[in-house]
Swiss-Prot record:
Protein name: Probable cytosol aminopeptidase
UniProt remark on cofactor binding: Binds 2 manganese ions per subunit.
Active site (UniProt): 275, 349
Catalytic activity: Release of an N-terminal amino acid, Xaa-|-Yaa-, in which Xaa is preferably Leu, but may be other amino acids including Pro although not Arg or Lys, and Yaa may be Pro. Amino acid amides and methyl esters are also readily hydrolyzed, but rates on arylamides are exceedingly low; Release of an N-terminal amino acid, preferentially leucine, but not glutamic or aspartic acids
First-listed, main subcellular location of the protein, grouped into a coarse class: cytoplasm
Length: 497
């Protein structure tokens, strides 16, 4: 596995030899002063001639790659288009960093972060480094034969107006990148490696960053009454775990925390209601919500966020055997509410129900957000580029939506109306675990809502974005690590003091 790229900073006036030289232009193909100086007359003239012959127009996210001419201290010239003046006024620096890293590949490059019509702040440069790091990620540790380019590590030297300021700002971006990479690694791991006990052990390594970690084993879960989660786990040879992570970064240690809760089904066969064979291999990623929570706690602790945040994940494997729970079983959750099992493949909500209730009752959080690859229905509704948001609180919903927009992890709020709640009423128990064919994402959210009292709460259904998502300029990984950037932005803007 890798996020293999080395990034350093130097002044715009620096000079160097070898590798790629990257400059930016708008749709008028004008070069900045720093870019012109770096290219020199031979490079400037070559770019102009090549642009005309190649019909390169400098459109946003376009590139022209040329062998460097004599007199230019580089192996290749990479000219990246930024588009019109309007485009340059709203550059997504994270995407630009990923696009640039993609064009450079496993090579060394000097990137002149200066161009016509824009001035890059230290924050912009930090976002650029975040995108470059995320684009360079690979998960290849199980490949015994690798291509030469897979073995090489890229190195970017960013020429900027304020190297020290950019480097300081980049430390925070580096923390976020590490959190996303951790989440991707967890999602990409095979389930024979990342079983519940091993997952819990890996999470316990967060203590090295100052995170307090508590692991609940089966005996403890039975003692407190986590009957819903334990029912899901009883068909597996692997015992479940609940892991609680506490980051106390606020000046006031007694300030109520924000709680982040993740579904951690490390493999979901469907249980007795077994899934079809096609695509079942993807069900190692049914713990993407928990990975986002772990990655976020890693990011917050790494950058010493001034906030109190609790992360909690329920880690189980949903398997069929003679001890597995069955359709028509009735289980008692930690809240005391009873659940009729209609479909054992609707297991994630049972896991979340007990964890939500435990965190709410024990830690009295100011808000709770759960993340789960919960339903195929949300993929039908929203596709694989946007997550579904359900919430009982307009203010929290608005904050999450804005944070997702700013971070590049978009959400769309979905309705929670009484009809969805009524759909999960049961003849034999307090509720059933599915609400029928229609509105599956909404009835799943309505189920979770029954385990939330008066606390502001949001549910993010990330089934479409958490795994096998659409490739982008900052992600070529099967496991996207989706949610870490959104949650980090949310904490930064609304919970840090």
């Amino acid at each position: 596995m890798a996020g293999g790229i080395e990034i350093t900073f130097e002044p715009l006036s620096s000079r160097g030899t070898g590798g790629d030289l990257v400059v930016f232009v708008g749709d008028d193909l004008a070069l900045s002063g720093a870019a012109s100086e770096a290219l020199g007359q031979p490079g400037t003239e070559l770019v102009a001639r090549a642009a005309a012959s190649e019909r390169f127009k400098g459109k946003a996210q376009s590139a022209l790659v040329l062998p460097a001419p004599a007199g230019v201290e580089a192996d290749r010239l990479v000219v990246i288009g930024l588009g019109s003046e309007k485009d340059r006024a709203k550059i997504d620096w994270t995407v630009l960093g990923g696009f640039t890293a993609g064009k450079v590949g496993a090579r060394s490059a000097r990137v002149v972060i200066d161009g016509p019509g824009f001035a890059a702040s230290a924050r912009d440069v930090a976002d650029f480094t975040l995108g470059a790091r995320l684009r360079s990620y690979r998960f290849d540790q199980y490949k015994t034969k690798k291509k030469d380019e897979d073995e090489a590590g890229a190195a970017l030297t960013l020429r900027v107006a304020d190297p020290s300021g950019a480097q300081a700002a980049a430390r925070s971006a580096e923390a976020v990148a590490e959190g996303v990479i951790l989440a991707r690694n967890l999602v990409n791991e095979p389930p024979n490696v990342l079983y519940p006990e091993e997952y819990a052990r890996r999470v316990s390594e967060l203590t090295q960053l100052g995170v307090e970690v508590e692991i609940l084993d089966v005996a403890r879960m039975k003692e407190i009454g986590m009957g819903a989660l334990l029912a899901v786990a009883q068909g597996s040879a692997r015992e479940p775990r609940v892991v609680i992570m506490r980051w106390n970064g606020a000046d006031d240690a007694a300030e109520p925390p924000l709680a982040l809760i993740g579904k951690g089904v490390v493999f979901d066969s469907g249980g007795v209601s077994i899934k079809s064979a096609g695509g079942m291999e993807d069900m190692k990623g049914d713990m993407g919500g928990s990975a986002a929570v772990v990655g976020t706690l890693h990011a917050l602790a790494s950058r010493k966020a001034k906030a109190n945040v609790i992360g909690a994940i329920g880690i189980v494997e949903n398997m069929p055997d003679g001890a597995a729970y069955r359709p028509s079983d009735i289980v008692t959750s930690l809240s005391g509410q009873t659940i009729e099992v209609i479909n054992t493949d609707a297991e994630g909500r049972l896991v979340l129900a007990d964890v939500l209730w435990h965190i709410q009752a024990t830690y009295k959080p100011k808000a709770m957000i759960d993340l789960a690859t919960l339903t195929g229905a949300i993929i039908v509704a929203l596709g694989q580029d946007i997550a579904g948001l359900f919430s009982n609180d307009d203010a929290l919903s608005g904050q999450i939506t804005a944070a997702g927009e700013a971070a590049g992890e978009k959400v769309w709020r979905m309705p929670l109306i009484p009809a969805f709640d009524k759909a999960i009423d049961s003849k034999f128990a307090d509720m059933k675990n599915t609400g029928g064919r229609h509105g599956g994402a909404a009835t799943a959210a309505a189920f979770l809502k029954r385990y939330v009292n008066d606390v502001p709460w949001a549910h993010l259904d990330i089934a479409g974005v958490g795994m096998s998502s659409t490739p982008s300029e900052i992600n070529r990984s099967w496991g996207a690590g989706w949610g870490v950037r959104l949650l980090d932005r949310l904490v930064r803007e609304h919970y840090e003091r």
